[in-house]
């Protein structure tokens, strides 16, 4: 057991430092092509590259371990200190991805066929997950790899609506203006704003506002973007109507939308992950997340799906991303034990 653990940790250190050294913000995933070509050869895993999104799939089989290769912007030089690995994506989600790759490799060596994907664009519009849907990929079971503290199993995510609002007004000289588009729309923003408070209450948050071209002229046009988050029990249509009614003089356009997801705690993937953790004397916790992930998209392939991964989720998108080799080992072991159980059901 000790020998296996040290093998996994050494391989994780090697692969994760290599992958962290490659800067892959959303839409730049092709930068990792040589990395995936090399590990495909070294680990004897068939490689498929999805052409529309530059997503990577390794291995074969009806079970998918799905993580993502893209990160948020801002490169962080990778380093290792006392078995802690630092770098952009160490937590979200190259650490979970490397855990999944190693698990896939070890399972493949045992004759258990499973696929692992480094999907593209999860941090933006999930074009990698959407390409799997568009091309009718079929999997019986899916585990999504996102940081969940190596103990938590995510069974629910909120949905999101990304809404552009374009408004027009009459430009006037600022010294004598009777109307001001910025002031008028600002009042409406305050009225429609819903601060993120708890999971079950929807949030409506302005994230971008642009208006005006001259110091002394009130704007003729104003652009506003709202980021809307809602749980599965909230009514999407009511949220859209509330905003539409508040901005009747403006043009509204949904530029991206991700549905909420909630899966049964009795589905086979959730159960297998829970048992895998218990076998390691780790108490599993079922949780719901306020954000979104590729699980929201991939639920269209199968409802036998859940999210789990190593890494402290509080460090996502921060400049302090770090993950321990022990966490990665727990992730590898959990994926392997869960899939060995699921494999028996196919």
Swiss-Prot record:
Reaction catalysis annotation: [amino-group carrier protein]-C-terminal-gamma-(L-lysyl)-L-glutamate + H2O = [amino-group carrier protein]-C-terminal-L-glutamate + L-lysine; [amino-group carrier protein]-C-terminal-gamma-(L-ornithyl)-L-glutamate + H2O = [amino-group carrier protein]-C-terminal-L-glutamate + L-ornithine
The record's Gene Ontology cellular component field reads: cytoplasm
Q: One biological-process term from Gene Ontology?
A: lysine biosynthetic process via aminoadipic acid
Question: Where is the signal peptide, in residue numbers?
Answer: none
Where in the cell does this protein reside?
Cytoplasm
Name its co-factor(s): Zn(2+); Co(2+)
Q: Which residues form the active site?
A: 70, 122
Gene Ontology MF: a single term: cobalt ion binding
Which of this chain's residues are annotated to bind Zn(2+) 1?
A: 68, 92, 146
Gene3D superfamilies in the record: 3.30.70.360, Zn peptidases
First-level EC class = hydrolase
Ordered alphabetically, the record's keywords are:
Amino-acid biosynthesis, Arginine biosynthesis, Cobalt, Cytoplasm, Hydrolase, Lysine biosynthesis, Metal-binding, Zinc
- Cofactor binding notes: Binds 2 Zn(2+) or Co(2+) ions per subunit.
Q: Which domain of life is it from?
A: Archaea
Give the protein family: Belongs to the peptidase M20A family. LysK subfamily.
Q: What does this protein do?
A: Catalyzes the release of L-lysine from [LysW]-gamma-L-lysine and the release of L-ornithine from [LysW]-L-ornithine.
Protein name, UniProt field? [LysW]-lysine/[LysW]-ornithine hydrolase
| Taxonomic path | Archaea, Thermoproteota, Thermoprotei, Sulfolobales, Sulfolobaceae
